[in-house]
Each structure stands twice: as structure tokens, then as C-alpha cells.
């Protein structure tokens, strides 16, 4: 299917509606009292490297620099990691590299990034490697005494940012991470609260809804995109077709853009910034899957069982109408010249050619369905997802996978292979994935999930709001 995004399309009224909904949600949150946190037991004592001058003494005493030193005692009563990593700065001094949000050190609040550590349990840290020092802190039980010079730089307020992961990540398999135990494992689609972005390569985050309160290290978008780009194959394989029009010859014309899968090959995904909105109605149901997976059966069942709720936008075509066909019902019949003009005017969200005839779905047809307060069903090529995934169309995207039961015929194996190719490239767009073992079961799960999405708070791309 040849694809073309409509450059003239904008967010429209739906964008305004979601923006207003988000603003109202923020105002309601502002009126709620903030939670109070209680630090762990810790003892601190201040002193100075040139004796004990009174507070407010000059920074220089007889040519010596006055440096405030703090003695910190931390009671470590469990096997819980301290949630801290160390590094050597440019002066080869041992400093705090990062503090994991929610960890032991973060909760008791006595250490900060950039603090210089002079002694651990009375032992001078000079001539000790970072690995040796971290091991000593990890293995110590009971009271840990640290002598530190506090970092005097101002500290930034906590971040309020949420990202949807667009790839799977396991820190145990990452050779770049500075500390595998400090890494955060997550899967595509997980919502990650970003706690700290000070390190350009390693951010700190926490999976939303997880029982684990402490944060972990995740690769920054820049690091992940560099990693993927550096190992990407020079010629990625073309994604299989899942178009309702079947396998089509590509229609090539001076008015048509190149197939957007070319641009997909250049896209390197990592994270997508999202915001949480109160419940709102999804306006479009999008079905994605390999050709032959059963999307047409599912679509037709939804249309026949819920005609007052779902509508399929009739495609436009240059094919001559058959005797039993009525213009505007199954298809809109137009001339090749008119369709070419419409394509040039960016009126189609998707178009292509099959057996010498052109087919396509117009934005306006979908808009008319929305104006009737009904839900448009689209079964489109996966390359079109980036075009329809907007606040204006507000889609709920469902990936239909082939059955994993029964005899593994050659045809089924090929279908599973095609399906996996689509999933691996476009999974970060999916709101729901279903295995189509039974059409009735798939329909039930799909409708339940769709209704749940429309009646519950939802994470949506920040571009839908701003």
C-alpha cells in the first residue's frame, strides 16, 4: 500500500478537547495535599578540614582553604542495597556519581550527587578503586560511617516526566550499563516515571504501578538510539503487507510520495513522553495484523453486532462499479484524474493500487463517522499508524496475531513469521495485542478492552495535549 500523510491536517477540535481535559485534571491535582515522607534514621555532624571555626568564618584562614566536612552515620539493618554508585572525578577523588530514587540513601537524604567521600568506616578511600569501595559498603552490616565534603552546588527540583517504553530492556544483558544491579528492567509499553536526567547516558526511572519503590538506571534516549543505529542492518527487510486490498502492486506516480516504510527504516525509537488523562472516548478502532490473520472477520462481526456503534469508512476507488454495487455504500467510485488530484491535495490517509485500479480511504470519510458520534473501524497497513495516531483520530490500536494452536502447517508458519515481523517493528504503537485462536473469544476480549480504555484514565502521547 502506498502511503501519504496529509500535511494539511491539524489536531482540530479533539486536540483542544484533550488539552482542556488535561488542564482540568492538573487543577484538580493541585488542590490535593502533598504526601509527607519520613527519612530513615541517620546521624550527621559538621566539622572543618582546618579545625573547627565558628559558622560564618572566612573561606580562607592563613592561606588554607576552609572545607566543610560532614560525618554521616547510616544504620544498615537489612540486605537492601544502598542505592548509590561512586566514581572518581578529574582530581581522582571519590565522589557520589548517582543516587537511585527511592533507595536507602535517597530516603534518608544525607548524601547528594557530587559529594566527595573521604573515609568509609574510618578508612581513607585514597588508593582504593571504585569497585573496592562499593563492595565494602555493600558488605558492611550495621552502622556505616562516612566522612564527606558536601557538594555546594544548588540542587534541581524533582522531575515530573513520564515516558512510554518503545523497546524491551534487560540490564543484565547490557554491556554498557555501569552497574547491572542498578538497572531497571522494562518491556515495550511500560510507563516509566523519569526521576533524574543529570547523566546524559543513564537516566533514573521507575516503572509506574510497580511494587518496587526505588528507581533504576535506564539508557537515555540518545544512548539507546545511538546503540540501535550502530548495530542496525544496512538494508532492513520490508514489512509484510496486511492491507484489506491484499497484495498490491505499488502505484508509482509523480504525485505520490515514496512508500513510508522507507522512512520507517530511518526511525529509531526509544521512549515517548506521555501524560495521564481522565477517561475519554476513543474515536477510532484500528486493527493491525498480517494478511490472512482474520481481521476482516473481526471487523465484519463488530459491524454486524454493533451497527449503532461501529462504522467502516467506505473506500474510494477508480474501479468501475459492478451491477449490484451502489455508489457511496461499499465504495465511492471516482475517476483516476479526480483521485490523483485528491491524493495531491493530501485528502487520503492511505491509498494504493490493486490489479490496475486505485483504492484509498479519505480523512473526511472518517471525520463524518465521528460527527455521527460513532466509532470508525480501520484495518490499515502498519506504516499508516504514524499518520492516524493523533488526538484528532484518537485511535485505539489492536494487533491481531495468528493462532498458536493446532497443526503447524507451512501456511500458518509463514503467517506467524509475517506477524512477528510486524510486531517487532510496530509493537510500540499497539494499545492491545490479541491472539486470534477463536473469533468469538477475540471479539469478546477486544470489546471489553475497548470499553475499559474509554472509561478509565489513560496515558496518551504528550503531543495529543500540547
Swiss-Prot record:
Molecular function terms from GO: transferase activity
Modified sites of kind Phosphothreonine: 49
Domain (SH3) ranges: 158-228
SMART domains, sorted: GuKc, PDZ, SH3
Every Guanylate kinase-like domain range: 282-451
PTM-bearing positions, type Phosphoserine: 13, 19, 52, 57, 110, 243
Annotated function: Essential regulator of neutrophil polarity. Regulates neutrophil polarization by regulating AKT1 phosphorylation through a mechanism that is independent of PIK3CG activity.
The protein's name: 55 kDa erythrocyte membrane protein
Gene label: MPP1
Amino acid at each position: 500500500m502506498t502511503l501519504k500523510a496529509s500535511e494539511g491536517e491539524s489536531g482540530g477540535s479533539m486536540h483542544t478537547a484533550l488539552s482542556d481535559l488535561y488542564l482540568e485534571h492538573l487543577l484538580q491535582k493541585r488542590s490535593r495535599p502533598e504526601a509527607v515522607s519520613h527519612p530513615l534514621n541517620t546521624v550527621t555532624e559538621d566539622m572543618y578540614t582546618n579545625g573547627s571555626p565558628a559558622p560564618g568564618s572566612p573561606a580562607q584562614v592563613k592561606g588554607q582553604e576552609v572545607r566543610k566536612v560532614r560525618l554521616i552515620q547510616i544504620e544498615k539493618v537489612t540486605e537492601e542495597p544502598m542505592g548509590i554508585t561512586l566514581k572518581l572525578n578529574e582530581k581522582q577523588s571519590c565522589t557520589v556519581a548517582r543516587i537511585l530514587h527511592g533507595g536507602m540513601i535517597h530516603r534518608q537524604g544525607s548524601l547528594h550527587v557530587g559529594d566527595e567521600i573521604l573515609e568509609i568506616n574510618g578508612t581513607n578511600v585514597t588508593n582504593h578503586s571504585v569497585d573496592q569501595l562499593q563492595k565494602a559498603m555493600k558488605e558492611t552490616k550495621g552502622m556505616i560511617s562516612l566522612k564527606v565534603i558536601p557538594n555546594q552546588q544548588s540542587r534541581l527540583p524533582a522531575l515530573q516526566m513520564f515516558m512510554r517504553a518503545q523497546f524491551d530492556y534487560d540490564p543484565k544483558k547490557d554491556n554498557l550499563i555501569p552497574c547491572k544491579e542498578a538497572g531497571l528492567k522494562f518491556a515495550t509499553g511500560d510507563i516509566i516515571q523519569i526521576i533524574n536526567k543529570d547523566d546524559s547516558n543513564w537516566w533514573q526511572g521507575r516503572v509506574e504501578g510497580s511494587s518496587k519503590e526505588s528507581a533504576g538506571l535506564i539508557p537515555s534516549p540518545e544512548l539507546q538510539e545511538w546503540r540501535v543505529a550502530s548495530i542496525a542492518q544496512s538494508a532492513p527487510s520490508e514489512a509484510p503487507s496486511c492491507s484489506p486490498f491484499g497484495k498490491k502492486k505499488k502505484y508509482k506516480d509523480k504525485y505520490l510520495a515514496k512508500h513510508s516504510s522507507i522512512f520507517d527504516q530511518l526511525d529509531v525509537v526509544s521512549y515517548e513522553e506521555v501524560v495521564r488523562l481522565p477517561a475519554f472516548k476513543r474515536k477510532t478502532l484500528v486493527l493491525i495484523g498480517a494478511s490472512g490473520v482474520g481481521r476482516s472477520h473481526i471487523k465484519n462481526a463488530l459491524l454486524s453486532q454493533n451497527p449503532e456503534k461501529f462504522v467502516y469508512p467506505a473506500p474510494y476507488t477508480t474501479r468501475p462499479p459492478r451491477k449490484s454495487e451502489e455508489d457511496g455504500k461499499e465504495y465511492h467510485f471516482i475517476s483516476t484524474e479526480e483521485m490523483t488530484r485528491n491524493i495531491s491535495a493530501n485528502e487520503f490517509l492511505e491509498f494504493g493500487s490493486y490489479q490496475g485500479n486505485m483504492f484509498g480511504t479519505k480523512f473526511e470519510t472518517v471525520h463524518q463517522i465521528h460527527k455521527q458520534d460513532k466509532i470508525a473501524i480501520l484495518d490499515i497497513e502498519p506504516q499508516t499508524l504514524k499518520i492516524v495516531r493523533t488526538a484528532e483520530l484518537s485511535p485505539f490500536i489492536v494487533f491481531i496475531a495468528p493462532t498458536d494452536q493446532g497443526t503447524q502447517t507451512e501456511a500458518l508458519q509463514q503467517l506467524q513469521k509475517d506477524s512477528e515481523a510486524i510486531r517487532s517493528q510496530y509493537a510500540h504503537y499497539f494499545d492491545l495485542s490479541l491472539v486470534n485462536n477463536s473469533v468469538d473469544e477475540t471479539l469478546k476480549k477486544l470489546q471489553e478492552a475497548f470499553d475499559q480504555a474509554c472509561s478509565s484514565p489513560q496515558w496518551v502521547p504528550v503531543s495529543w495535549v500540547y
